């Protein structure tokens, strides 16, 4: 018994002496220019993925200056949406790979105040291109959606979103 304990202790001491002390890792913080360059590269890569997605779908979308893409595929005849109005919408939200994340199909239409409520920035912009009764596809890049963090529920970090949306009504 003493022999086995001595044997185990000998190897424990032997192997512990050979281990190098690990130095704490130094965390390098990127400069403002490096951060801007990383964001620019991410944005360009994301726009490329979005353009490839649009080409695969064969959609003739309009791209806005901000990077939002939209296509009205069914025209309504109602009033034009404007900032400050309350919009009532039906929608489904999915990722570029087709994974459906959210839909109003089970919860019912969703109201939000344009340019006021806490919804995706791209939705605030995109809804202003619609009239009551319009059905549209919108591709909202991650930087106009939930950004670097996602929504901590279903939307992952850096995720561009595909909205299939119908503007049901507007009120002041």
Regions found by a protein language model. Name each.
Residues 1-15:
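Sec-dependent bacterial lipoprotein signal peptides
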Residues 5, 17-172:
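Cross-family detector of peptidyl-prolyl cis-trans isomerase
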